[in-house]
């Protein structure tokens, strides 16, 4: 943290444009990249091979221009002159990521000094935990939904150019372009027959995550400009990601914008019932208006990707549905808005009336097939959604195996406790319980019935099932007691941290959807 502050102070006081270039050759930059105290991003694939001595030798060779060019030209070879260049390339890429993060941290710092702090404008930026209450409170009043799959750039150069306007150091920018140009010829970065989307799904290098997030933020900043129909962005945090003076030139392919009279040109965007949610490479646009407006937004997104980012995105990238007729997948849930018809008797003087009221409520159901596949991937159930004994957990201690199944069951309960229909929810918990019993019985080399008699099954029941689960097993489904419990919907604040297989759920469902 102190190192970051020191570099920020150095950049703030410096008047040279090429201050980022010498930072790239400092060993302490790579110490920040591979240290565990970075507050920018979680360190990925860290191991003890990245020592300061290796980085120092690498930076010494990089000072020599001939060796650096040879290193780039021979990036497809495992070794050259006794050095592992693929390994060195990974080190250099992490260094690029830290230097670029320092650059944008400096711009955020300068913006805060000028009174452009973005704390007040965070009222429209909410965490993932507020999405589920949003569905219950506001989604029922909207009628159209658009599923958007954010396309990947076809070439890494598009991502690099996104940082060109913000990078003041021309030498550093050309160095990044030079390195990517030669490094892309190697087999270790871009597979010849695979696209950049496959590359991003398998690689989590710091610099590529930053460039991709920069691309998404710039695309969303243009979307927010169109949404807010204003000549000045309301979310000041986006101002650091592109130059304002080039904005109207970039946007001219989408709509005709007049800088003097912008409100009349973008008057048709005025709609208070529009909401945008982005998660895991996809986004949802929901609004309450005619189908014409949401179809306009569909083609605005397509033209934006084609004209601004040179990304071909066909109409099949965006799906438009009515919320009252279709359900959609979101973070492992099936969400729908059914309309319930209720009859209210009203009496005025001697006359009585029957009034029919349509009540729309958000119904969130657990995806049983995807949840069973996620439990099978975690070796907690069989592929046919049946209880199975985990061979890996059988070799561990009995307390460790029980804790593992309890943790999975608890995470599953916390994540799906807000669902309206909990039949699938109870089925998965039933599978997890008996998978744990089978695993422990296999460890003790006995049958399930013998193991239950020996260990007392009531204790396992208390561990695996809450009071609500026990009522669902004891009372009939039509019981008033069960219906009283089933109406209770609780959203936990730590759902994304407690659920270990939410990413697998979304990948499984998303692969079928798009």
UniProtKB/Swiss-Prot annotation:
Compartments in which it is found: Plastid, Chloroplast
InterPro entries cross-referenced by the UniProt entry: Domain_X, Maturase_MatK, Maturase_MatK_N
Keyword presence, Chloroplast: yes
Annotated keywords: Chloroplast, mRNA processing, Plastid, RNA-binding, tRNA processing
Keyword RNA-binding applies: yes
Annotated family: Belongs to the intron maturase 2 family. MatK subfamily.
GO cellular component: chloroplast
GO MF entry, a single one: RNA binding
Function comment: Usually encoded in the trnK tRNA gene intron. Probably assists in splicing its own and other chloroplast group II introns.
Single GO biological process annotation from the record: RNA splicing
This protein's name: Maturase K
């Amino acid at each position: 943290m102190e190192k970051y502050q020191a570099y920020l102070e150095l950049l703030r006081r410096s008047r040279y444009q090429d201050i980022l270039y010498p930072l790239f050759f400092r060993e302490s930059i790579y110490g920040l990249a591979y240290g565990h105290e970075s507050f920018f991003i979680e360190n990925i694939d860290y191991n003890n091979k990245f020592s300061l001595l290796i980085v120092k030798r690498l930076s010494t060779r990089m000072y020599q221009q001939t060796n650096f060019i040879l290193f780039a030209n021979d990036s497809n070879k495992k070794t050259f002159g006794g050095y592992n260049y693929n390994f060195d390339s990974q080190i250099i890429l992490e260094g690029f990521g830290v230097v670029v993060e320092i650059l944008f941290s400096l711009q955020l710092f300068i913006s805060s000094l000028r009174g452009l702090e973005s704390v007040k404008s965070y009222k429209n930026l909410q965490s993932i935990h507020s999405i589920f209450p949003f569905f219950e409170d506001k989604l029922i009043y909207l009628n159209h939904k658009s599923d958007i799959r954010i396309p990947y750039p076809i070439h890494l150069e598009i991502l690099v150019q996104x940082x060109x306007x913000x990078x003041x150091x021309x030498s550093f920018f050309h160095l990044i372009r030079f390195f990517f140009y030669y490094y892309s010829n190697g087999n270790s970065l871009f597979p010849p027959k695979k696209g950049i989307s496959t590359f991003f799904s398998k690689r989590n290098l710091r610099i590529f995550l930053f460039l991709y997030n920069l691309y998404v933020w710039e695309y969303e900043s243009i979307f927010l400009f169109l949404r807010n129909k204003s000549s000045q962005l309301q979310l000041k945090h986006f101002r650091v990601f592109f130059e304002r003076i080039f904005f109207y030139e970039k946007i001219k392919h989408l709509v005709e914008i007049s800088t003097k009279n912008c409100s009349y040109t973008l008057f048709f965007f005025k709609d208070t019932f529009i909401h945008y949610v982005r998660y895991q490479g996809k986004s949802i646009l929901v609004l309450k208006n005619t189908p014409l407006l949401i179809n306009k937004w569909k083609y605005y997104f397509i033209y934006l990707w084609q004209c601004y980012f040179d990304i071909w995105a066909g109409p099949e990238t965006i799906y438009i549905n009515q919320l009252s007729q279709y359900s959609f997948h979101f973070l492992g849930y099936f969400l729908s808005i059914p309309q319930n018809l209720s009859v209210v008797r009203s009496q005025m003087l001697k006359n009585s009336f029957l009034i029919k009221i349509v009540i729309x409520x958000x119904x969130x159901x657990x995806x049983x097939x995807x949840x069973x596949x996620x439990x099978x991937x975690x070796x907690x159930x069989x592929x046919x959604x049946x209880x199975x004994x985990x061979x890996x957990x059988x070799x561990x201690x009995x307390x460790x195996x029980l804790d593992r199944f309890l943790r999975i069951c608890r995470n599953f309960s916390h994540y799906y406790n807000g669902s309206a229909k909990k039949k699938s929810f109870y089925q998965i918990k039933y599978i997890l319980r008996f998978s744990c019993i089978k695993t422990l019985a296999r460890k003790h080399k006995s049958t399930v019935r013998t193991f239950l008699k020996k260990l007392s099954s009531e204790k396992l029941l208390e561990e695996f099932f809450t009071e609500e689960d026990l009522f669902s097993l004891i009372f009939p489904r039509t019981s008033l007691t069960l219906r009283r419990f089933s109406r209770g919907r609780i959203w936990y604040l730590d759902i994304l941290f407690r659920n270990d297989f939410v990413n697998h759920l979304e990948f499984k469902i998303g692969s079928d959807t798009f």
